Each structure stands twice: as structure tokens, then as C-alpha cells.
């Protein structure tokens, strides 16, 4: 995360006893320390959390729970997109982000990814399903088969 890389897992790990709020505060302040910045003030951090929760349609109660503990599949994926939004990485690798999501949850995740995409950020989205690509606006699509790129589409 220090260098701007974010990795989302197909099966996000649960971290019992560590609240999302504490987890994100530690991650953001570690990144800020690496960049030579002061720790984020509590009010600024809470405002950022509210903004990013709204971005991905995340219920405020999830941020008080332990990281991914007892979360549904959709909540875990939404939580990962929330983490990505909070950390604002240069490159995000999203592994099977659509796995186990219903259409509504997938739409919210796709909207979050689309809102974070700009000239200074990139995302590699790994998926086996076209449905996510219908919602995310990719610049380029590479189709891999048996470890090789067999087709490329895009500008």
C-alpha cells in the first residue's frame, strides 16, 4: 500500500477483534507516515470514512464490526472496494470481485470502481464473467486463455 498498490482477494480474510475503523485508520496513517505526513486527525478521518462509505453504499454499522467477520459475500466485496477507496491506490488488482455477488451488489461495486477511475489510477480486474464488464467501463480488455492473451479490445 505504501507505493500505491491495492490487492483485492477472491476470498477476503476475516480479522476477528479488529474493527474496520481501527484497521483503516492504521492503514491510512501507515501510508501517511511513509509519505512523511502527519497522522490524519480523527474528525478528518471520520469525514473521509463517511464519504467513502457513501461511495460504495456501505452501511455505517459495518465499519464498527471486525474486518470481514460474519460479513456476507457481498458485504466482503463491498468492504474491499471501500478499503480501496479509502487508500486511493495508483494500481488496484481486483481478483474475482464479482464472485458471489447478486446484481445489486455487483452494480454498487462497479459504480465504486468507475467513480475511482481517473488519469492517475489503474485497475486490473480479473473476472470470468462478462456481466461485470457490462457495468465497469474498462479502457482495455485482455482475454487470457491457458496463460496467454488471445484477444485484446479497447482504444
Which residue stretches match the model-derived regions?
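ABC ATPase NBD coupling module
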Residues: 1-6, 116
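ABC-family P-loop ATPase nucleotide-binding domains
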Residues: 3, 10-90
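Walker B motif beta-strand of ABC-family P-loop ATPases
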Residues: 90-96
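Walker B catalytic motif
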Residues: 96-97, 104
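Helical segment within the ABC ATPase nucleotide-binding domain
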Residues: 106-119
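Conserved H-loop
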Residues: 120-136
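H-loop (His-switch) and adjacent beta-strand-loop-beta switch element
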Residues: 136-153
